[in-house]
């Protein structure tokens, strides 16, 4: 014990289990001794630590603290809280407390937790007698571990868990491991009584379970063997040691015989006498004992008969009780099953209701989604219009600035025309004086010989560029096809948007306002087609016949036959073309062609005529003639390329139209760039045909063409192949930059499409979730039906199982009766054996065995009584649970009623909200009417006041008119009256001025009020529409209200049915309570009977103990007699009689041994039969456990059904919340739509104003067109006069061309000698080259004007060809920003400037681009190449350069006019600077 007191005891007390158990003293009301003692005790404990540990250990092993803890864990377990202190000493108290603790703990595990403790029971004797031993410590540790497992599984487990959390982390981890060992059935400490059936387990789980069970059985068998061995040792120790006492006198007599034989004989005789006397006494005692034994046997027979009668009665009582229990169980299960069926029906009805609600919510959500989609579409359309509005505002500002510049350009062009006329007159005079050309000049033959070298060089230079551009075009086509394939695989919503974008609202066409077709902000065709119309060329009238034959225009008759009629009319006759142009405006026809074509190239845009101005007209006409003549050779190839590009460009447009719904500005950029690429690709054919134009100009032509071709050759400057390659490099780099930017934008568009696809997938996923929830609700409904059917089947199976169990019990009772009969037969046989007197020992042993059998039977009866008691307790608990379930059902019914009331309240609230909305609408209508009335009354009052003021002013004017007459008469009166009248006159004038100002302010207010009145009327109309919608909504809500009322009535009816069912359930519950009370009364009677039997059994046990004591005394006496008899036989060894007697005695003993062996075999047979009966009882208990498990499964299924119902309720609540969110989003969208409609009305007002301004501008354009036609006729007449003079100059043509080429290479404007013929042409070329540089240094040439439907292009041919070259060539800018801005300007109107001056539409900024491309350190040659990139940019550069040419030529002719133009350019420069960077970026 000293060894156990050392480290083992300290280690146990410092462990987790002891710490936890000692810490529970505060929970049970005990304070630790260390906290409750005085200071002196604390000092003693500090001095004596060993004593403190012993006290703490004794406090644990005493059992009192653990019993209190167990009272908290299992307050309802049998036995109650009973502790014994100091009755029979501390050891006995400890043993009794620990025994009580173990019994209650074992019952708690078996009854409450349904677990069987597999560990052996603790050695309570060791723990009570030797508490400080290692065995006692181990047993206490196992008890504490089981107590810990029970504490975390009881009803007050939260209290114990909170206490465990208050300990350290190490202790918590150790306690968690101990809890896991105790609570898990597979750990080997406990075994689950109600486990799953073998059919429900997998083969592997079955194998694992069998292995664990075999291990447990082997361990239990070993423990059983050890216990039996220990019990045998204890029984051997209990036998007295008096068997050795008779041997002492025998040894002494033997010694006496050896020493004194004589004395030995005398002593033997005396002993014989004494022995005879003792034998006689013993015979008497044997007779008495036989009589007593017979009496005992009679009593035993009587007891057996009584026990048999009692057992028969007990069996009958058991049968009756079992039958009554079975009937009661059936009767009790019927209402419960009916209740469960009713609950299932209610759940089915609730599921149907939830299903209907889910369908309604789904329909409502679909309607809300549809309305949301419509509102989003309207919102996108409104956003697009607002974006167009902003663009129109910007373009209006640009157009106003451009109109002023165009007017200035017209003035300068008129001045130039006058100067050109004077110069032409001078040139005619010089030609008449100096030149006399012979008719047959050899220059015509030599001229083509020099041109081919330059033409070949240009073709070689352009071939490389064309190949590179074609490669880039192929790459772009592949990218566009990939994008188209990706877009085609998107959601059908994009296709609907594409169809909406393809079918925009087209405004009404009015022949009086032809330009309105392109200025409507609602036409996408204007947006896209405007790019082509911005970049149109306006050729001279002589080139109309050639334009119709060009490759670009050759495509027009296929899709646009309207474009042929004006061109053919112009090509027939100049006079007829003039008449046709005057009668029918070509802009109208070409605009119609544009709208029909949609998205075409620039040459298919409308052609607007502009009057030629001077010799520049001849140059442009001849240039166009040369181009169209040289394009006929590769026409087929270019037509094929243009058709491919046309087929590709519409493929891109639907994609851009789709994406404008999301990002209008970015998509417009992408579309502009795609169209610009198509224009550049088509312009390459035009550049390739430029050298052929030179050849056609140099060859023999018709008189009119040759006469126009000479000035074109003079003004045309062809660079060398090296210069052409140098100029092609920046253009190619710009094209590559545009291609890279297009690729980036395409990637951005793909990202946006992917995001949109993800949003569509999210919406489809939501729809799928809703459908899955609906399907799940249907599945749960079907499962509920199936579970109800399964419950019915299980109930039938339970009934069958109960019947089989009753049959098995009857069989067991019959087997017990058979055992009793076998025992009676064994008793009869034993009676036969007990008739022999000498065999008393065998009879006593048989009596002991019979008594033990009776004890075992009594124990069986007691165990059965305990089982019946436990079953009754279980029945009570089930009845209590049934009562609780009935209460829960009542609570649920009340909860359902509350939910129905809440639903009714919600409907009332919803109806009230609808009424409030109606009242709000009515209030708004009243307010609008009041505001309108107030506005009308205020206007009327203001008008009345104005009229009154006007009348007052008229009266005062009349007075003032009469005042001079009064003055004339009053002057005679005196000077004082004159002064007073003068003061009055001044005051009257002041009053007049104030009245005029007030009148103007009132007029402004009146206009403002009229605008407000219009807006209020629009709002009133919107409110009327909203009120109509609200009325429709209210009608729908009233219909829904009627439906909800019908549903409410149906629910009330169902509620009445449920209440009736609840009443029936309560009546059934009362009946079950009555039955339960009857059962309790029967149980009390049985308990009293059992108590009486227990008292009788106690009396029998007392008598049995007395009989045992007598039997032991008889056995002692018998042993003494046997010893003496053996001594006598030893002494009479020499006597033959004694030997014969001894042999006979031995034979008898052998026969007795044989009989005893037979009895032992019979006993073994009876024990085997008893074990079989116990096995049958175990099987019956197991089947009962299975029935309990099935009952638990039914409960779990019911819990699952309730959980599914709760999930359905949660899903319905989520759907309601989502519908509320959709309502809120719909309200927000309606407000946004109202705001957008207001913006739309404002935009429409502005558009009307712009249309009026456009109409005024179109009238001005017509006037300018008429003037230009007149000036063109004048120029035609002058050109016919010049033809005769120009034919004489062909002989010196070759020399002049060489001089011009030298002049191109040198680019140094020096004076040429006038001695040679044609020197005035070189001077002319110098004058044309010089101002181009000077114009660039001054900030670029003035801004030209172009565009489809624009009328500022009528100012001259330099403006007609300018946009074509700029836009088609792409040299001016590498970004589509100018195209986008100019395109937006085609679809919008103008606003008047501050000064009232009107400006023209569709003007462009070519000069800004060229000026931005120059740098201060450039040489004149570089600047010339930048302005004139060669044949590739011939139209644009030439027209741009020619526009500056005439400014410069004017400067060389007259210096004062040059100063004026420079001042005009300096005045226009600030306006251009803020627009040029945006166009050249």
Swiss-Prot record:
SUPFAM superfamilies: Hook domain. Residues 200-225, 258-491, 731-1308 form a coiled coil. It holds the Pfam family HOOK_N. The keyword Plastid does not apply. GO terms for cellular component: centrosome; cytosol; endoplasmic reticulum; Golgi apparatus; membrane; nucleoplasm. Transmembrane segments: none annotated. Disruption phenotype: Mice show defects in T-cell functions including impaired maturation, significantly reduced activation, reduced cell division as well as impaired cytokine production in response to specific or non-specific stimulation and during the course of infection with the mouse malaria parasite Plasmodium berghei. Residues 660-695, 1453-1472 have a biased composition (Basic and acidic residues). Its main location: membrane. The modification Phosphoserine is found at residues 441, 649, 1353, 1384. It comes from the Eukaryota. Residues 430-458, 494-731, 1331-1481 are annotated as: Disordered. It is found in: Membrane; Cytoplasm, Cytoskeleton, Microtubule organizing center; Endoplasmic reticulum; Golgi apparatus. Keywords: Coiled coil, Cytoplasm, Cytoskeleton, Endoplasmic reticulum, Golgi apparatus, Membrane, Phosphoprotein, Stress response. It is a peripheral membrane protein. Homodimer. Interacts with DOCK8. Interacts (via C-terminus) with intact microtubules. Interacts with dynein-dynactin motor complex. Interacts (via C-terminus) with HSPA5. Acts as a positive regulator of T-cell maturation and inflammatory function. Required for several functions of T-cells in both the CD4(+) and the CD8(+) compartments and this includes expression of cell surface markers of activation, proliferation, and cytokine production in response to specific or non-specific stimulation and during the course of infection with the mouse malaria parasite Plasmodium berghei. Belongs to the CCDC88 family. PANTHER family: COILED-COIL DOMAIN-CONTAINING PROTEIN 88B (PTHR18947:SF35), HOOK PROTEINS (PTHR18947). This is Coiled-coil domain-containing protein 88B. The gene is Ccdc88b.
């Amino acid at each position: 014990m000293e060894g156990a007191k050392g480290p083992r005891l300290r280690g146990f007390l410092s462990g987790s289990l002891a710490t936890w158990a000692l810490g529970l003293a505060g929970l049970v009301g005990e304070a630790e001794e260390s906290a409750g003692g005085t200071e002196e005790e604390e000092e003693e404990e500090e001095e004596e630590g060993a004593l403190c540990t012993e006290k703490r250990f004794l406090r644990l092993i005493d059992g009192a603290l653990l019993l209190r803890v167990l009272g908290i864990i299992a307050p309802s377990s049998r036995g109650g809280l009973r502790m014994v202190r100091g009755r029979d000493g501390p050891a006995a108290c400890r043993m009794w407390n620990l025994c009580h603790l173990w019994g209650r703990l074992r019952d708690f595990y078996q009854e409450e937790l349904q677990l069987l403790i597999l560990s052996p029971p603790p050695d309570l004797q060791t723990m009570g007698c030797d508490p400080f031993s290692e065995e006692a410590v181990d047993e206490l540790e196992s008890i504490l571990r089981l107590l810990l497992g029970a504490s975390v599984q009881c009803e007050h487990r939260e209290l114990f868990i909170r206490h465990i959390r208050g300990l350290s982390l190490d202790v918590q981890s150790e306690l968690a491991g101990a809890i896991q060992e105790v609570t898990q059935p597979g750990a080997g400490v406990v075994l689950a009584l109600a486990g799953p059936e073998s059919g429900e387990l997998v083969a592997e789980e079955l194998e694992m379970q069998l292995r664990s069970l075999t291990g447990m059985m082997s361990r239990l068998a070993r423990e059983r063997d050890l216990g039996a061995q220990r019990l045998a040792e204890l029984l051997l120790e209990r036998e007295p040691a008096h068997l050795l006492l008779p041997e002492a006198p025998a040894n002494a007599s033997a010694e006496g015989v050896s020493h004194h034989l004589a004395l030995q004989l005398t002593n033997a005789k005396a002993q014989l006498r004494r022995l005879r006397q003792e034998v006689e006494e013993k015979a008497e005692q044997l007779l008495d004992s036989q009589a007593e034994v017979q009496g005992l046997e009679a009593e035993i027979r009587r007891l057996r008969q009584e026990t048999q009668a009692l057992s028969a009665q007990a069996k009958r009582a058991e049968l009756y009780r079992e039958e009554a229990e079975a009937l009661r169980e059936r009767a009790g299960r019927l209402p419960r099953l009916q209740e469960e069926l009713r609950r299932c029906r209610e759940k089915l009805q609730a599921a149907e209701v939830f299903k209907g609600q889910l369908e309604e919510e789904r329909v409502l959500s679909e309607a809300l989604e549809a309305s949301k989609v419509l509102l989003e579409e309207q919102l996108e359309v409104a956003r697009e219009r607002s974006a167009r509005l902003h663009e129109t505002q910007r373009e209006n500002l640009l157009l106003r600035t451009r109109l002023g510049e165009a007017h200035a350009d017209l003035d300068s062009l008129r001045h130039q025309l006058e100067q050109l006329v004077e110069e032409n007159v001078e040139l005619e005079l010089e030609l008449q004086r100096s030149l006399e050309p012979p008719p047959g000049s050899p220059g015509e033959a030599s001229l083509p010989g020099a041109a081919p070298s330059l033409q070949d060089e240009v073709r070689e230079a352009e071939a490389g560029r064309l190949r590179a551009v074609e490669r880039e075009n192929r790459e772009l086509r592949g990218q566009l096809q990939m994008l188209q394939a990706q877009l085609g695989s998107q959601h059908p919503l994009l296709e609907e948007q594409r169809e909406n974008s393809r079918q925009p609202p087209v405004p009404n066409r009015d022949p009086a306002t032809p330009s309105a077709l392109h200025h409507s902000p609602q036409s996408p065709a204007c947006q896209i087609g405007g790019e082509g119309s911005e970049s149109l060329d306006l050729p001279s009238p002589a080139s109309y016949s050639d334009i119709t034959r060009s490759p670009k225009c050759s495509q027009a008759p296929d899709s646009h036959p309207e474009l042929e009629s004006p061109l053919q009319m112009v090509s027939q006759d100049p006079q007829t073309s003039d008449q046709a142009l005057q009668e029918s405006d070509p802009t109208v026809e070409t605009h119609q062609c544009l709208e029909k074509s949609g998205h075409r190239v620039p040459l298919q845009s409308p052609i607007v005529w502009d009057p030629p101005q001077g010799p520049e007209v001849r140059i442009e006409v001849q240039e166009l003639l040369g181009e169209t003549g040289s394009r006929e050779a590769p026409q087929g190839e270019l037509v094929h390329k243009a058709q491919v590009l046309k087929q590709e460009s519409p493929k891109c447009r639907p994609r851009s139209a789709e994406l404008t719904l999301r990002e209008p500005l970015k998509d417009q950029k992408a579309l502009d760039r795609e169209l610009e690429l198509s224009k550049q690709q088509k312009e390459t054919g035009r550049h390739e045909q430029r050298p052929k134009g030179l050849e056609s100009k140099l060859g023999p032509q018709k008189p009119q063409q040759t006469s126009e071709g000479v000035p074109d050759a003079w003004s045309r400057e062809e660079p060398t192949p090296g210069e052409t390659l140098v100029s092609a490099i920046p253009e190619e780099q710009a094209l590559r930059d545009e291609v890279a930017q297009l690729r980036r934008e395409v990637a951005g568009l793909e990202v946006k499409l992917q995001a949109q696809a993800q949003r569509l997938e999210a919406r489809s996923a939501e729809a799928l979730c809703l459908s899955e929830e609906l399907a799940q609700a249907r599945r749960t409904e079907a499962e509920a039906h199936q579970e109800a059917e399964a419950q019915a089947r299980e109930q039938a199976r339970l009934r069958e199982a109960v019947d089989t169990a009753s049959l098995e019990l009857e069989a067991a009772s019959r087997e017990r009766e058979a055992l009793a009969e076998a025992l009676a037969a064994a008793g009869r046989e034993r009676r036969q054996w007990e008739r022999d007197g000498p065999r008393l020992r065998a009879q006593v042993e048989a009596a002991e065995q019979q008594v033990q059998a009776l004890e075992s039977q009594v124990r069986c009866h007691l165990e059965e009584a305990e089982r019946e008691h436990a079953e009754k307790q279980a029945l009570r608990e089930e009845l209590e649970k049934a009562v609780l379930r009935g209460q829960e059902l009542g609570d649920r019914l009340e909860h359902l009623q509350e939910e129905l009331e809440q639903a009714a309240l919600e409907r009332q609230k919803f109806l009230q909200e609808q009424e409030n909305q109606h009242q709000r609408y009515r209030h708004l209508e009243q307010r609008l009417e009041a505001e309108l009335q107030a506005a009308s009354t205020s206007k009327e009052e203001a008008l009345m006041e104005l009229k009154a003021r006007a009348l007052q002013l008229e009266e005062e004017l009349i007075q003032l008119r009469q005042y001079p007459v009064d003055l004339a008469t009053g002057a005679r009166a005196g000077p004082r009256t004159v002064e007073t009248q003068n003061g009055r006159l001044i005051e009257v004038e002041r009053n007049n001025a104030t009245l005029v100002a007030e009148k103007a302010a009132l007029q402004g207010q009146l206009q403002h009020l009229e605008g407000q009145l219009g807006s209020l009327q629009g709002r009133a109309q919107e409110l009327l529409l909203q009120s109509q919608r609200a009325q429709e909504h209210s009608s729908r809500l009233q219909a829904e209200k009627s439906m909800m009322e019908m549903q409410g009535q149906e629910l009330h009816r169902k509620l009445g049915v449920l209440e009736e069912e609840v009443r029936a359930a309560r009546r059934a519950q009362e009946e079950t309570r009555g039955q339960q009370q009857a059962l309790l009364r029967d149980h009390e009677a049985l308990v009293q009977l059992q108590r009486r039997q227990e008292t009788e059994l106690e009396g029998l046990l007392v008598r049995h103990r007395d009989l045992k004591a007598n039997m032991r005394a008889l056995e002692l006496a018998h042993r003494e007699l046997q010893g003496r008899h053996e001594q006598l036989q030893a002494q009479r060894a020499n006597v033959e009689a004694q030997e014969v007697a001894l042999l006979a005695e031995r034979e008898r003993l052998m026969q007795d041994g044989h009989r005893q062996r037979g009895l032992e075999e019979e006993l073994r047979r009876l024990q085997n039969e008893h074990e079989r009966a116990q096995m049958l009882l175990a099987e019956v208990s197991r089947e009962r456990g299975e029935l309990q498990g099935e009952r638990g499964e039914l409960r779990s299924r019911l819990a699952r059904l309730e959980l599914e119902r709760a999930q359905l309720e949660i899903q319905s609540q989520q759907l309601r919340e989502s519908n509320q969110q959709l309502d809120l989003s719909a309200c927000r969208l309606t407000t946004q739509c109202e705001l957008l409609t207001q913006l739309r009305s404002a935009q429409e007002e502005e558009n009307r104003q712009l249309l009026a301004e456009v109409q005024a501008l179109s009238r001005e354009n017509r006037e300018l067109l008429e003037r230009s036609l007149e000036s063109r006729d004048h120029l035609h007449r002058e050109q016919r006069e010049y033809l005769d003079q120009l034919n004489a100059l062909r002989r010196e043509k070759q020399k002049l061309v060489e001089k011009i080429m030298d002049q191109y290479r040198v680019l140094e404007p020096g004076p040429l000698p006038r001695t040679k013929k044609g020197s005035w042409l070189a001077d002319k070329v110098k004058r044309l080259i010089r101002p181009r540089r000077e114009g660039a240094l001054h900030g670029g040439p003035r801004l030209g004007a172009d565009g489809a439907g624009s009328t500022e292009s009528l100012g001259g041919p330099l403006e007609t060809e300018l946009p074509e070259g700029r836009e088609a060539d792409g040299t001016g800018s590498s970004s589509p920003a100018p195209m986008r801005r100019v395109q937006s300007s085609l679809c919008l109107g103008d606003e008047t400037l501050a000064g009232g001056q009107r400006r023209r539409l569709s003007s462009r900024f070519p000069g800004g681009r060229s000026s931005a491309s120059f740098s201060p350190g450039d040489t004149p040659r570089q600047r010339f190449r930048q302005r004139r990139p060669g044949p590739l940019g011939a139209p644009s550069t030439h027209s741009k350069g020619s526009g500056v040419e005439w400014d410069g030529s004017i400067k060389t002719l007259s210096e004062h006019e040059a100063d004026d133009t420079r001042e005009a350019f300096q005045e226009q420069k600030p306006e251009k600077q803020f627009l040029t960077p945006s166009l050249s970026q």
